[in-house]
Amino acid sequence: MDFLKLSTSCAAICGCGLVILAASLPPARGQTPDSSPAPAPAVISGTPVQPASPPATTTAPAPAAAPAMPAASDDDLLVPDKPKAAAPTASSDDDLLGPMPPKPGAAASSDDDLLLPQGGKPNAAAGAGGVLFPDGPQRAPANLPPGSMPPAGVIPVVSTGDAAIDHAKMLLAEKYPSASICATCHPKQFREWSFSQHAYAQLSPVFNTMQATIDKRASGTNGDFCIRCHTAVGMDLKEPVFTSNLNRNATSREGITCITCHRIRENYGKVSARFGLVQGDILQPMYGPKGNAILKQVLAQPDVFQVVTKPGEAGRAIHTDVVKFDPLEKSAFCGDCHDVNLLNGFRLEEAFSQFHNSPANKEGTTCQDCHMGNTPGIKSGFGFGPAAMVGDKPTPSRKLTNHTFAGPDYSIIHPGLFPFNTKAQELASLAEWLTFDYQAGWGTDAYEKTAPADFAYPGRWKSVDDRYDARAILDDQFSRLEDVNHQRYQIMRRGIQLHALNVEQNDAGGIKFKVKVANNTLGHGVPTGFDAERAYFMQATVTDRLGRVVFRSGDRDPNGDYRDIESQYVHDWKLPMDKYLFTLQSKFLVTLIRGGERVQILPSNKSLDPLPFVRPPTNADALTGRSPGARKQAVVIPPGSSRWASYEVRRDQLTGQAPYKVNLKFITQMVPVNLLGEIAEVGFDYGMSPKQVGDAVVDRSQTIWDKTVVLPSKPVMIDLTPSEADVLAPPYKPFLTVAAPAPAAKQAVKVADTTPLSRN
């Protein structure tokens, strides 16, 4: 995301590709700090990664603070509310690549992070903490009342016994009803949403860290651009852009929650989530595609359905109206968020634009037809049944849509936190769930019957009954995760398919073959959306009759990356580049000062100015024929199209032990591991280390196709097109592998009662 049309980096000047802002990279997978791996551990900019210094006391390290400048109430997000700050002086030239004029008499900063103002002293307006200085204390932004933020280094743990809520928090809850309230009458829709990408949007530790890194590198001027899609409620509440989700309002944590769509009353269009939510408690009207005909029937029978429509009345609170809002059934409504265009003109995501120009749109198919229908990824009709269960009484049947929205993202966090589960929320707080060791088998007979009586559990889990209750909830969570994983496999298999294997040569002189990879959809490219960070790739492995590997492409380095130019092991010349790699991951290209371009993982320019800013462009890209700062090189497969992956096994690689066979795996992974190393400087939520995040991202990736073919001795074209049964088949492996319960160790295990943002 070169969100910044700024001065070119020092790295760009020399073209060496070194990253100025060093970032922590996850240790090699499967290695321990005491091991001697070969090849050597990854380094960044030639410097071995060092863990952050541990705190001097048992107090958790402070979470990375919110950006130093709170957003203003207007839309530009570039000017703080109070006090008014002087606008930065622009360069005299139009390309915005020149340095800012220095202050009279001030010398440039000598440090190389280029984030300090001139003179090398911290920005007085930013204070000692803030997003530019993540090790400093956390401060309450100016638009929050005193006492709203926890003390430095402490994230409060809310006990289940804390039933009292102050009046202000109660009002916030009323303005933005939680999905858990909607679940009372809409259990089907709630369950589908509970494990959806929409529900996970704000909980994702990868997203939150990426948002914070971008804001840090842009001196806070990116504002809420990214996060306002992920939690419109949180931004309406003026929450800090970057803070632990444990600090956020309950509805804010729900990401794209019920009211994000059903409390919108205007047709905004492609506004990158710059829309307004209608505020009000659960009694206020909702907005839906069908209007209020069924609701009127319910309201006309209050004795039957036991509903109330006025505050203070005894009964089941219900919204008083459903206002018919036709755009909810139109593709343009999805374009509110799914076309992401930055204020500087950079086109980051183009899912809706791709659809708008697709064959599917020309045929009259909508986004909702394929993504809310009976079968993920295909126009397959909709369900029919009661839209609500009011008490134990169903409402009259009508068209039903699927709110799962299965796609490429998946959860890497504790199953007590996600999927959303009302019983889990009632049993324990998020921080308490983080201390429940489900992988050790807590709450299972196998564990509890062998656990020592003196084992020291965290306070919330001292009771064996509570541990059994937690395990029962988690069993339901595991079921939900497998459910959405199956839907994810279906939609990925629907979109990306292996259609043919063309064997061109197989003799003593070598082996040549090609694989046809097709976009089987007509609605948009594959991948789409955030395609520059989607690690979709082919693994091709050729073995002889004895099982010895003679050729491999698409294999991973010890960090979990494939061997392209962004692999740290390739970058450091510890592994060769995979010249046969087939990947659908688009690339960010940044402009060098001499006019060339190079790939950059997170293309936020390292400005020559003391403080980089996100600024609107001063001229149209069409005038120059190129972006002045960065661009995205798309390698996605267009709708209904295909690409060939070509491979060649040299003569000297053959063993003479024919027949040879090739195994083809197509893998979809939500982000590459190298991105995690690039953004790790600000830490990850829930106390997760970069290695934990990287391991989970890799371990839960999907092998959507796995085919083995014995290579014939003569040239031939082999059809690999999958059947409908193949598309709908179960995944090759479970989504979440829970370790077998082991007897508890006899020594006490100390578990902190606070959960910090990790910098380790």
Predicted feature locations:
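Conserved, well-structured interaction surfaces
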Residues: 232-239
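Primarily the internal scaffold of c-type cytochrome electron-transfer domains
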Residues: 131-173, 189-218, 222, 239-606, ...
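Compositionally biased, proline/threonine/alanine/serine-rich low-complexity intrinsically disordered stretches
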Residues: 30-161, 736-760
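Sec-dependent N-terminal signal peptides
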Residues: 1-33
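Hydrophobic alpha-helical transmembrane segments
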Residues: 222-230
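An acidic-aromatic substrate-binding cleft motif
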Residues: 175-179
